[in-house]
A protein has these predicted regions:
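Residues within the helices of the helix-turn-helix
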Residues: 3-8
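Residue-level detection of the helix-turn-helix DNA-binding "recognition helix"
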Residues: 22-26
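Short, Lys/Arg-rich nucleic-acid/phosphate-binding segment
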Residues: 32-50
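Long, low-complexity, charge-rich intrinsically disordered regions
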Residues: 52-175
Length: 175
């Protein structure tokens, strides 16, 4: 897949996709090749092995985490709430939503009151550097879900099982 095709597929500019290719090259991740004069990405058949190779160098897409008093009822689900949509895991009593850096101001998240330690949580909103709507249903993509989860969330056995189920069904087994 060429840089321009990759950019279209994930909904970013060609320049952003080119920077991603540059980072892959810099990190010495063996997925880039040349087709004529164009750089191309060649995803190996064993996606799970590739993920295990690159997960340690990928950045968490979460820029900031807002823990709010009121449920903002935002359409995009992220983090643990998105994981629940992909698996049989039950969600927290409060949902986790996503807004991109661009959407943050218009969403009103910054003016909402954050909870103190003793208050009940209405929702969690993750400000993300990017949001890939994986199934066109407003759910964060599975790989970004894994990167977005806190260490505490990932340590829970039920969450770990759900992560593995999600990756197996939506990522490793996909054509």
């Amino acid at each position: 897949m060429k840089v321009s095709d990759a950019a279209k597929r994930i909904g970013v500019s060609t320049k952003s996709a080119s920077r991603c290719f540059d980072e892959l090259e810099y990190l010495n991740i063996d997925v880039l090749g040349m087709k004529g004069k164009s750089r191309v990405i060649n995803i190996p058949d064993d996606r799970k092995q590739l993920w295990q190779q690159i997960e340690r160098v990928l950045r968490n897409p979460v820029i900031r985490r807002f823990v709010l008093r009121e449920d903002m009822k935002i359409e995009k689900k992220a983090g643990i709430s998105a994981l629940c949509e992909y698996s049989l895991l039950s969600d927290n009593v409060y949902p986790t939503y996503a807004v991109t850096k661009r959407e943050l101001k218009a969403s009103g998240v910054k003016v909402e009151k954050q909870v103190s330690e003793l208050e009940e949580i209405g929702c969690v909103v993750l400000e993300l550097g990017y949001f890939i709507d994986f199934l066109g249903k407003g759910f964060q993509d599975p790989l970004s879900v894994v990167l977005s989860l806190t260490g505490e969330e990932q340590e829970e056995e039920r969450v770990d099982i759900s992560i593995n189920e999600m990756l197996e069904e939506y990522v490793w087994s996909k054509d």
